[in-house]
Amino acid sequence: MRPLRGTYRLFLLAVALALLLTLLPLPTWLAVMKPMALALVLTYFALEAPEVAGLGHAFLFGLCADILYGGLLGEHALRMVILVYLTLRFRHRLRFFPVWQQAGAVFALLLNDRVLDLWIRWMSGSTWPPLVFWLSPLVGMAVWPWVFLLLDGLRLRRRQAQRERSS
C-alpha cells in the first residue's frame, strides 16, 4: 500500500502544479497556444498509474479547473473525463509505444479535446476561436516527451527511495 500512497502524493502535487501553471498570465496571442497542463498530467497518470488517475479524479479535477478558470461549470470536467477514458481504453497499447509515438497519440487526444471544446462553445453560443486555437495540441505533443520523462523520473526516484527505506 505504501507505493500507492507515494504515487498518489505525486499525482496530487502534479495536478496542483498543472492547475497553477495554467493560471499563469501570458500574452493573448501566446495564451491560446498554451497546452492544457492538466490534460497532460492526467494522461500521464492514466497511462502509468491508472490506480490513482481514474474517471472520478478526472471529473473532480475538471470541476476544479472549471472553478479556477471561471468557465462553464462541467466543461473541463466533461473534457477531462473523455480524455482519461480514451487514455485508459487504449492504455495497454500506448504504454509500449516509444515516447515519440506516444506524443502522436497525445496529439490525437488533445485534438479530440479541442474538438469537444469547440462543440461546447458552439452549443453555448460563444464566439468562434481564432485559428491559433488549433496550435495547442501541437504544443502539447511537443511538450509531451519532457512531461513524460519528468514525471516518470520522479516516480522512479520515489520508488527507489521507498525500496531503500524498506531494506
Q: PLM ranges: what are they?
A:
Residues 1-167:
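Terminal, non-globular segments
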